[in-house]
Amino acid sequence: QINYTCTNLAEHIEGLDHNSVYRYLKHERLTPRLIWEHAQETLVMSAVGCIIFDDTVADKDYSFEIEGVRKQYSGNAHGLVKGIGIVTFVYYNPELDRYWVIDYRVFDPDRDGKTKLDHVNEMLSLAEKRGVQYKTALMDSWYATTQMMTRLHQSGKVFYCPLKANRLVDDTEGEESYQAVEMLSWTETELQQGKLVKVKGFAKNFYLKLFRVTVST
């Protein structure tokens, strides 16, 4: 078994002890601002760049007194785990095929009352203030809210996100009632090229191109 932890570093560097490493890790704070400053050193932006909203859970199953540790859903574990939730903001340059983490937030609603969507909105506003160039946003269904998609649309951006199976949409231009995505019927042409739908709650003339994609889980 290979131990990649920072505390195990003391076993391999002469003159470095576990207590020194522990004290450093305990007091070091890699803040979102430091992440941005570090990313700026190598960040190459593109007019066709992409931003990616995502989140992960740092497993802390055996930790009981670390700030921010709570039970929360993990997509990787497909269930509740004990850990620290982290919302990440990633920049991708498709011309160079390179990624940069340019911002993050700790998801700790018990401390600050903020949702994951709140964090993403804050990071997006900050990225715009910093002059981050992008054309496309990629996000999970968690962030595919009416507010977020409308914001991106009004900014002239393209976005890709999955819609939950029970999301109500209309593909009949108002001739029939809204129905769940999973209940839609698809022609062969629509399976190849997608179909226009209106998501319930969106502005009257706001249509999305919906594609049916089979993925493995």
Enumerate the predicted regions with their spans.
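A generic local secondary-structure boundary/capping motif
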Residues: 76-79, 149, 197
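An anionic, glycine-rich sequence signature occurring as long contiguous blocks
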Residues: 97, 102, 110, 158-217
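Electropositive, glycine- and tryptophan-enriched low-complexity nucleic-acid-binding patches
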Residues: 19-23, 74-134, 213-217
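Active-site-proximal, Lys/Arg-enriched surface segment
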Residues: 25-96, 205-206, 211
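Short, conserved acidic/polar surface loops in the N-terminal third of protein domains
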Residues: 61-67, 100-103, 149-150, 171-172
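Domain-level cores of phosphate- or acyl-group-handling catalytic modules
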Residues: 109-174
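Gly/serine-rich nucleotide phosphate-binding loop at the start of the catalytic core
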Residues: 1-31
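A structural signal for short, well-ordered beta-strand segments and their strand-loop junctions
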Residues: 5-8, 50-53, 101, 136-138, ...
